[in-house]
Structure formats: structure tokens, C-alpha cells
Curated annotation (Swiss-Prot):
Gene that specifies this protein: yabA
Keyword field contains Secreted: no
Annotated family: Belongs to the YabA family.
Major localization class: cytoplasm
Annotated S-S bridges: none
Organism: Listeria monocytogenes serovar 1/2a (strain ATCC BAA-679 / EGD-e)
Localisation: Cytoplasm, Nucleoid
Cofactor note: Binds 1 zinc ion per subunit.
NCBIfam families membership: PRK13169.1-4 (NF009643), PRK13169.1-5 (NF009644)
Assembly with partners or alone: Homotetramer. Interacts with both DnaA and DnaN, acting as a bridge between these two proteins.
Protein name: Replication initiation control protein YabA
Length: 129
């Protein structure tokens, strides 16, 4: 092979490597977005399952008189609502997100934490009482 052909071949390979690198970057970005969405959907499903189980437990027996007629919530319903408030589901969801390697701070919310490194902003948010 002559020198020009070798140079052209190396230049062509360099272009192909650049394109592959770009494709790999795009793929990595898409994968990160999919992981974030998957995590968000898993947390939402867990939250909805908890609410459904609380609703099923708190469903009062059918009565002739309804809550709307009295204008007051049934005692079981009040207890379920109070339990839901006490659970601190939002905080639990943030802790779960952080444990799975995502930022929960307002600076980088939802983006993956690099190499599972701790984020001071996230930790300060999670340690608030």
C-alpha cells in the first residue's frame, strides 16, 4: 500500500471511531433517562400500591347513610388519612432514590450520582428534621 492509501484508511477509521463515540454517548444518555424514568415509575407504583392497600383496609362497610350526607369523614377514613400523613412517603421516596444512586437535591435532582459518590446537598436535605 502506498502512503496516501494508508493515510486515507487511518483518516476513515478516525471518522468511524468519532461516529461510534457519538453514538455511544447518545446511547449512554438514553440509558440514563430510561433508568431515571424506570426508577420514577417503580416509586410511583410502590406509592400507589401503599395507597391502594390503605384504601382497601379503610373501606367502611356499606351503610344507608354516606359521608356526604353527614358532612363528616368516617372514623376509618380519618385514621387512614392520618396514617398516610405519618408515613412520610415523600421523604421515603427521596431516600430510596438517593440509595439507588440519584441526586435528590434541588441542584442536580434526578441526575445519576457519579460512582455512587455522596452529595453534600442531598445529604443535608435528607438529614433535615
Amino acid at each position: 500500500m502506498d502512503k496516501k492509501a494508508i493515510f486515507d484508511s487511518v483518516s476513515n477509521m478516525e471518522e468511524q471511531i468519532g461516529e461510534l463515540y457519538q453514538q455511544l454517548g447518545d446511547l449512554k444518555t438514553n440509558l440514563g433517562e430510561m433508568l431515571e424514568e424506570n426508577n420514577r415509575l417503580n416509586l410511583e407504583n410502590e406509592h400507589l400500591r401503599r395507597r391502594l392497600s390503605l384504601t382497601d383496609e379503610a373501606t367502611p362497610e356499606p351503610k344507608a347513610e354516606t359521608e356526604a350526607e353527614h358532612g363528616v369523614m368516617a372514623p376509618n377514613r380519618k385514621e387512614a388519612m392520618q396514617q398516610m400523613i405519618e408515613l412520610g412517603e415523600g421523604y421515603d421516596n427521596l431516600v430510596q432514590l438517593y440509595k439507588e444512586g440519584f441526586h435528590v437535591c434541588n441542584v442536580h435532582f434526578g441526575s445519576p450520582r457519579g460512582n455512587d459518590e455522596d452529595c453534600l446537598f442531598c445529604l443535608s436535605l435528607l438529614n433535615k428534621k
